[in-house]
A protein has these predicted regions:
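Glycine-rich phosphate/diphosphate-binding loop of Rossmann-like nucleotide-binding domains
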Residues: 11-45, 169-223
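Hydrophobic beta-strand scaffold residues
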Residues: 40, 62, 127-129, 221
Length: 223
């Protein structure tokens, strides 16, 4: 089935505060140029960080209907009511730890949602690939996909910006207003936080991302 047409679908995120996307226009353009048997359809979204027209320029199709997609990509948890039976989905479902709550009476809305999501996935014969579980099978099971580093970078940037505000100093542009990391580094490097004492805990991706940003902010690491 070498020449079989494979259709990829890109979801419009269910959360109104989510602007990220699993595939950028540049990535879609690359995929379509490399694989002649590939078709990509994208749900329209006003919240996404890229405009619908940016996807149209790549050759992708814009449509609400993803029923023809073989594989559907998202970022965060999907609206359960929109799940299409017999499909393969990839997104951060955060359902890995739900098993420990099976049989328990749960009031936490987030856990209730995840349990309902898994029930619907099973009911509709869906193959769910959670980005969180794409790991190296050796050693400590290193996660290949995660937002930790950038969460740390942006968290540190926003915290320093809040510090400026609380001390009645001129604030920097919000992180959401800056469209690339190089610009973030350029802006923060012009500030002087050398008298600020910061305690940073943890050793994961988020903390390493925060340390990375603080170096550009002229904050000296002492331990």
């Amino acid at each position: 089935m070498k020449n079989k047409i494979i259709t990829l679908g890109v979801l419009a995120e269910a959360r109104i505060d989510e602007s990220r996307t699993p595939l950028s226009p540049a990535q879609i353009s690359y995929l379509l140029s490399k694989y002649s048997n590939l078709k990509i359809i994208v749900q329209p979204s006003k919240e996404r960080c890229f405009k619908d027209k940016d996807y149209l320029k790549t050759g992708a199709q814009i449509t609400d209907n993803l029923s023809s997609a073989d594989i559907i990509f998202g970022v965060k948890e999907v609206d359960i009511s929109t799940l299409i039976k017999d499909k393969t989905y990839l997104f951060f479902s955060h359902t890995s730890k739900v098993r420990q709550h099976i049989g328990q009476v749960i009031k936490d809305k987030a856990i209730i949602y995840k349990k309902e999501l898994l029930k619907e996935v099973i009911k509709k014969n869906i193959t769910l690939i959670d980005y969180e579980n794409i790991r190296d099978t050796s050693g400590e099971g290193y996660r290949y996909l995660g937002f930790g580093r950038f969460a740390g970078i942006i968290g540190a940037y926003n915290t320093l910006n809040l510090y400026l505000k609380l001390n009645n100093k001129q604030q920097l542009p919000g992180a959401f207003e800056i469209n690339n990391y190089e610009q973030v580094k350029k802006i923060i490097s012009k500030q002087n936080f050398n008298k600020l004492k910061i305690l940073l805990t943890g050793s994961g991706r988020a903390s390493k991302g925060a340390i990375e940003l603080l170096k550009y902010a002229n904050v000296r690491q002492v331990s």
